[in-house]
Every structure is written in structure tokens, then in C-alpha cells.
């Protein structure tokens, strides 16, 4: 292992396997050791916010907006790949690079905005898990929130044993979500030909479809996922030369394609399930609880329970990931962090306040997405700037077609976020043409 420096969290066995792979001594198991960061980050694309948006899209417009999910998934792959590359090449996360490179007049506001975004993210994910538990166990929502908090804290304690146990648990929950939606597709009558057609044929039936499309794409690249992915990728190993860095980036790109590909297919399955189950007879469904209560009489209790299990796995796993991202944001921007139990407790408070005040959980989810839309330019533009700097990234600086695609993706995401905010505040945005 002399040709590679391992970072805390790698077991001796894993570190040896990493060294063998980077030295070109391949084994059948070795590629699996690089899996983890993208799997964890992919949870951001299967969180309860995605559930609500995709259910609304499928219920109201059938398969018409599947192409939007495909576009969103491709953009997500690009930016998560850039985030992982940044961590591998520099050994630092995005927040640390901002602190070390930019003046305090910029980094302090960036930190505050990013912390608010992390709390807004955790609010949505925490509420999603709580809704799943409450509906599944027939408990009050407050009780569901308390159980969600305890479960997520228990998973977070695994971090004391290194990042691998945590990644395995998150990966297992990703598998649960994927299997649940595979089962749903076997139960729900899906028109596969229409689904395939609308995946590649863009269409916007009316102005309201634009609103939902913006909601799907505009919330795709999550601020906390960009911070977290760079940190997890940089925390693995310290490559000793350019060849090792290139290999790590290549393996990372493969993992991003696989993990985000699964996330994209899960999102497409959500839309297809909602289209097959609810469209056109139940077009007005827009809330998670309403979808659950409608599924049971339509397709049986089994379909409804599977839906809740997937929601629970999504809420718990994404809440864990959101807490980890919040820790990384604080550590990166200001150089210190608070105990994980304290952050978990603090991020639970807004959820209890929201529900205690009688705010509709779905409304709270929507408001959290507004906050994320406002915060998104901070990590996205910083990531683009760092990724294209040859002085920082060397030969792995993003350029050419990749740079053009990244800039184009940023313009699409930021433009759609502006449209989303305009629509939320009552400004009517007409369809093009």
C-alpha cells in the first residue's frame, strides 16, 4: 500500500484492494470498493420531494412528462460527476475550497445560505419519513416524526465505525426503494409503448404542465448533494500521481452513471406508476397521503403498503444524508462542526414547529423547495468555477464539450428555478410559442 495514502474510514483490507486496483492489479471484486459516494448522493434524487412532484406529474399528465425526468437525470449525472472529480483531484470538499479560495465577504454569506438550504432539505426529508411511518403504523404525525428522528440518529451513529457501514446501510435503503417501485410496476397496469414514446418525445400539454416540469428539473441538482459528493469522494484515498487520479475519476464516473441511472429509473417508475394508477380518473391527486389512500381501493392494500415502505426508506435515508451534508458544509466553510446528535436535534426542530402550527406537510415540502431554489446558485456556480480552473484541477480541468454541457446545464437549471419562483409568487409564465 506504499503507492497510496488511505484516509480515515478505510479498513486495511479495503485500502489494499484500492491500492491493487489503482496499480492495475485487477480482481473481480475490486471495482466494488469504489462504490459508495455516488450511491449516497443519489438519495437526493429519490427524496420525498421527488415523490410528490412525480406523483403529481403522472396523475395529471400520464406519461407526457417522462422526458423531463430523463433530462433531469442527465443533468444530475453531469454535475454529480463534476463534484466527485473535484473531491478526487483536490482532496477537499466544495465548501473547503470556497473557504480557502474566496474572500470572507463571500464565504460567510455562502455558508449561511448553504446552512439554511441544508435545514430546508432536512425538513422535507424528515417530514417524508415521518409521513411514511405515520401512515404505515397508523400513528399521529408527531409520533412518526419522533420515530424518524430516533431511527436516523441510530444510522448516523454508524459513522463512528468509518464511512463504509454508513454507505452500506444507505445503499441497502436505495435497493429497497428500487425494489418497491419494481414491484409497483408489476402491479400497476403501465402502457409501456406510451411510456417509451414520451420518454424521448418532448411535449408540454398546457401551462400547468410547465409548472410541474419546472418543479421536476428545477429541483434536480440539490445543493447538499454537490457539497456531500465532493467530500465523500475526496475522503476515500489520496492518489499519489496523475495516473491514479485519472483512474479514480474514471471509476467515479462509472459509479455516477450506475447510481444516478438507478435514481433516474426510480423517478421514471414513480411517474409511470402514478400515470397507470391515477390517470385520467384521479388527476387531482397532488399529496403523498392522498396517493396512498387512493392506491388501496384501486390496486389493493399491497400496492399501498409497498408505496409507503418506499417512502419510508426514502425519508429515512435522505434525512441521514442531509444531516451528513450539513456537517460537511459547516466543517468546510468555518472549520469546525457540532456533535452529530446536536445537529440531528436542531434539524428536527423546524419539522415539529411546522406540524405543531398546523401547516400542511405538503405545503411545507413546497416551501422547502423554494428555499433550495434560492440556494442552488451558490454550490452550482462555485463548482463550475473550480472545475474549469486549470491551476486547481490540472489536466483534469473540465473543458471542451464537457464544459459547454456543464454551462448549458447550469443555464437550464438556474433558468427553470427562476421560472419556478416566478410561478410560486403568482407570475404567469406562458408556454413557448
Curated annotation (Swiss-Prot):
User: Could you mention a single GO BP entry for this protein?
Assistant: iron ion transmembrane transport
Per UniProt, the keywords (alphabetical) are: Cell inner membrane, Cell membrane, Ion transport, Membrane, Symport, Transmembrane, Transmembrane helix, Transport
The answer on whether this UniProt entry bears the keyword Nucleotide-binding reads no
Q: Which residues cross the membrane?
A: 32-52, 62-82, 101-121, 131-151, 168-188, 209-229, 256-276, 296-316, 345-365, 366-386, 401-421
Subcellular location as annotated = Cell inner membrane
Write down the superkingdom of origin.
Bacteria
Membrane association type: Multi-pass membrane protein
User: Under the GO molecular function aspect, what terms does this record hold?
Assistant: cadmium ion transmembrane transporter activity; manganese ion transmembrane transporter activity; metal ion binding; symporter activity
The primary site where this protein sits is membrane
Q: Which GO terms describe its cellular component?
A: plasma membrane
UniProt-listed Pfam families: Nramp
Identify the InterPro entries for this entry.
NRAMP_fam (IPR001046)
Protein function? H(+)-stimulated, divalent metal cation uptake system.
Q: Which family does it belong to?
A: Belongs to the NRAMP family.
NCBIfam families recorded: nramp, Nramp_1, PRK00701.1
What's this protein's name?
Divalent metal cation transporter MntH
Record organism: Acidiphilium cryptum (strain JF-5)
Protein encoded by which gene? mntH
Amino acid at each position: 500500500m506504499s503507492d497510496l495514502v488511505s484516509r480515515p474510514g478505510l479498513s486495511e483490507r479495503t485500502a489494499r484492494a484500492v491500492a491493487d486496483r489503482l496499480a492495475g492489479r485487477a480482481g473481480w471484486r475490486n471495482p466494488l470498493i469504489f462504490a459508495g459516494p455516488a450511491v449516497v448522493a443519489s438519495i437526493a434524487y429519490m427524496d420525498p420531494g421527488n415523490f410528490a412532484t412525480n406523483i403529481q406529474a403522472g396523475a395529471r399528465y400520464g406519461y407526457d412528462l417522462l422526458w423531463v425526468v430523463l433530462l433531469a437525470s442527465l443533468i444530475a449525472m453531469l454535475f454529480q460527476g463534476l463534484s466527485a472529480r473535484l473531491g478526487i483531484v483536490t482532496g477537499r470538499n466544495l465548501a473547503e475550497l470556497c473557504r480557502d479560495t474566496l474572500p470572507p465577504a463571500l464565504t460567510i454569506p455562502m455558508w449561511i445560505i448553504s446552512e439554511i438550504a441544508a435545514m430546508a432539505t432536512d425538513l422535507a426529508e424528515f417530514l417524508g419519513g415521518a409521513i411514511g411511518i405515520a401512515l404505515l403504523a397508523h400513528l399521529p404525525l408527531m409520533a412518526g416524526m419522533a420515530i424518524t428522528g430516533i431511527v436516523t440518529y441510530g444510522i448516523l451513529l454508524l459513522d463512528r465505525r468509518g464511512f463504509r457501514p454508513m454507505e452500506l446501510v444507505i445503499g441497502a435503503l436505495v435497493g429497497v426503494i428500487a425494489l418497491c417501485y419494481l414491484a409497483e410496476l408489476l402491479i400497476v397496469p403501465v402502457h409501456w409503448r406510451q411510456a417509451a414514446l414520451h420518454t424521448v418525445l418532448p411535449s408540454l400539454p398546457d401551462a400547468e404542465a410547465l409548472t410541474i416540469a419546472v418543479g421536476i428539473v428545477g429541483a434536480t441538482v440539490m445543493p447538499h448533494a454537490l457539497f456531500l459528493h465532493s467530500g465523500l469522494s475526496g475522503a476515500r484515498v489520496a492518489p499519489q500521481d496523475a495516473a491514479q487520479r485519472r483512474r479514480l475519476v474514471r471509476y467515479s464516473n462509472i459509479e455516477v452513471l450506475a447510481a444516478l441511472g438507478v435514481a433516474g429509473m426510480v423517478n421514471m417508475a414513480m411517474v409511470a406508476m402514478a400515470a397507470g394508477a391515477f390517470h385520467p380518473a384521479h388527476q387531482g391527486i397532488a399529496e403523498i397521503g392522498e396517493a396512498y389512500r387512493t392506491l388501496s381501493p384501486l390496486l389493493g392494500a399491497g400496492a399501498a403498503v409497498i408505496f409507503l415502505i418506499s417512502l419510508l426508506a426514502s425519508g429515512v435515508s435522505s434525512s441521514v444524508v442531509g444531516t451528513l451534508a450539513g456537517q460537511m458544509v459547516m466543517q468546510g466553510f468555518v472549520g469546525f462542526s457540532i456533535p452529530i446528535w446536536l445537529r440531528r436535534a436542531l434539524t428536527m426542530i423546524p419539522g415539529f414547529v411546522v406540524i405543531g402550527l398546523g401547516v400542511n406537510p405538503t405545503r411545507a415540502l413546497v416551501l422547502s423547495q423554494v428555499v433550495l431554489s434560492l440556494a442552488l446558485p451558490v454550490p452550482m456556480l462555485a463548482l463550475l468555477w473550480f472545475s474549469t480552473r486549470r491551476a486547481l484541477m490540472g489536466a483534469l480541468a473540465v473543458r471542451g464539450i464537457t464544459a459547454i454541457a456543464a454551462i448549458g446545464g447550469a443555464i437550464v437549471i438556474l433558468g427553470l428555478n427562476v421560472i419556478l419562483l416566478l410561478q410560486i409568487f403568482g407570475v404567469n409564465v406562458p408556454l413557448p410559442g
